[in-house]
Design a protein with these regions (language model features):
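Glycine- and charge-enriched loop/helix tracts that form the active or gating conduit
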Residues: 1-132, 136-153, 157-174
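Phosphate-backbone recognition surface of nucleic-acid-processing proteins
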Residues: 176-181
Length: 181
């Protein structure tokens, strides 16, 4: 279990993202007291570079994204990443996605990605962020038609949504260009 030991945790809100990536990397759950304390913090004064460093570690070293990103959801930090938050409210057709909604599907995909990393940091960064962003268009395109859940055009719609998300994390134009078509 990951747990803050003093209230100094609040002096640098980046520690919330650090807990996210440590949780995903090491397989530790975050203690409920730390989750509650994290809810009181904001990332508004954290530079993009520092934010990106923690997301980069998550993508390159995370093994259990359900733990890491699940912590982000539990401490309500998905409010800073509405593109991800919306995935949790978007159902999918259970015939094609028995694992559940788009959020759950994305976490499963990230866990699968973690098992096949290539060893090339750049390639893993591109693929990892592509996996994270691959269904961001579904919340804006999902419809129920003839009792089936469909998301026509979600890939195309997701490009600008993913671009906005990535631009808030990093100014690495080459990375964004390679992640997005």
């Amino acid at each position: 279990i990951l747990r803050h030991t003093t209230n100094r945790f609040t002096e640098d809100p980046l520690r919330v993202l650090r807990a996210m990536q440590f949780s995903a990397r090491l397989g530790f759950r975050v203690h409920e007291d730390t989750v509650a304390l994290s809810r009181t913090l904001t990332q508004k004064d954290i530079s993009r570079e520092r934010l990106f460093d923690e997301w980069k570690k998550l993508i390159l070293k995370g093994n259990d994204f359900q733990l890491g990103l699940g912590f982000l959801k539990d401490c309500e930090w998905l409010r800073f990443y509405p593109e991800l938050q919306e995935l949790d409210h978007c159902d999918q057709d259970p015939e094609w996605h028995p694992e559940g909604n788009v959020w759950t599907h994305t976490l499963h995909c990230l866990n699968a990605f973690a098992k096949i990393r290539t060893g090339d940091e750049w390639e893993n960064l591109v693929i990892g962020f592509a996996v994270l962003c691959h269904d961001m268009g579904k919340p804006k395109t999902t419809i129920v038609e003839n009792k089936r859940i469909r998301s026509p055009g979600h890939a195309r719609k997701g490009v600008e949504i993913a671009r906005s998300f990535l631009h808030r994390l990093t100014n690495h134009k080459n990375l964004i260009a390679e992640v997005l078509p």
